[in-house]
Amino acid sequence: MELVEVLKRGVQQVTGHGGLRGLLRVFFRANDIRIGTLVGEDKYGNKYYEDNKQFFGRHRWVIYTTEMNGKNTFWDVDGSMVPPEWHRWLHCMTDDPPTTNPPTARKFIWTNHKFNVSATPEQYVPYSTTRKKIHEWVPPSTPYK
């Protein structure tokens, strides 16, 4: 009986992702193949799933969209692509997804997603207000004879 359940779940994984091509696409993007119930989709196109047969912490996941705000994100996914209301549900801060219980609007939450610019030339670098402890050596400029 257990072998039948394993085979049944394997067939569900292949058919649930749209055949072999869809299965490979999900595997290369997420490095994991899971099946679950679609809980909802955010305004950017990210899809959120849940499978209560998995253990806590691995039972909720997101499949990121391939295009966000005009940028191709097929290979360049980032954890900051999840909106705050879905972040609450994804990290088990609440049991109700935003589709059934929408959160209250806050003025500090962005209306449109801004990409994480860390480790890029656009990153924020604060101005240093303290003096350097170590100064680089500048050789004296004496003309050669």
UniProtKB/Swiss-Prot annotation:
Lineage, broadest ranks: Eukaryota, Metazoa, Chordata, Craniata, Vertebrata
Cellular component terms per the entry's GO annotation: mitochondrial inner membrane; mitochondrion; respiratory chain complex I
Topology of the protein relative to the lipid bilayer: Peripheral membrane protein
A biological process term (GO) from this entry: mitochondrial ATP synthesis coupled electron transport
Subunit note: Complex I is composed of 45 different subunits.
Role according to the record: Accessory subunit of the mitochondrial membrane respiratory chain NADH dehydrogenase (Complex I), that is believed not to be involved in catalysis. Complex I functions in the transfer of electrons from NADH to the respiratory chain. The immediate electron acceptor for the enzyme is believed to be ubiquinone.
Modified residues (N-acetylmethionine): 1
Family listed: Belongs to the complex I NDUFA12 subunit family.
Protein name: NADH dehydrogenase [ubiquinone] 1 alpha subcomplex subunit 12
Major location category of this protein: mitochondrion
Keyword hit for Isomerase: no
One Pfam family in the UniProt entry: NDUFA12
Subcellular localization: Mitochondrion inner membrane
Classification via InterPro entries: NDUFA12 (IPR007763)
Classification via PANTHER family: NADH DEHYDROGENASE [UBIQUINONE] 1 ALPHA SUBCOMPLEX SUBUNIT 12, NADH-UBIQUINONE OXIDOREDUCTASE SUBUNIT B17.2
Keyword line: Acetylation, Electron transport, Membrane, Mitochondrion, Mitochondrion inner membrane, Respiratory chain, Transport
